[in-house]
């Protein structure tokens, strides 16, 4: 499925709404979806097979992609983190900020 920046912006609205009412889980999910959509848009123009085919694959791959700046990789790593996984120390305590960091970078390289 092809997504547009309008789809990304709509998902960001859901993210902001969920975060505002204190639904952190829904906010993290919306952040991952928004970032996944944006990466998908970027991959249409710049195919990278190693990124896989799902939003979570996209975000996980971005977390270790050396071509991305360290702050973007860190934001992606935190968005991949699960609060219920004690082995993983990095998880997003501010999914809005992490999503915005990644989305701003993707928009800048379009």
Place the predicted regions along the sequence by residue.
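Charged alpha-helical initiation segments
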Residues: 1-23
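Helix-centric, low-specificity signal for extended rod-like, repetitive segments
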Residues: 9, 21, 25-26, 66, ...
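Heptad-repeat amphipathic alpha-helical coiled-coil interaction surface used
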Residues: 12-16, 27, 34, 103
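Alpha-helix N-cap/helix-initiation sites
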Residues: 24-31, 48-49, 92
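Hydrophobic alpha-helical packing segments in soluble, helical-rich domains
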Residues: 27-45
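Long, charged low-complexity segments
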Residues: 43, 48-110
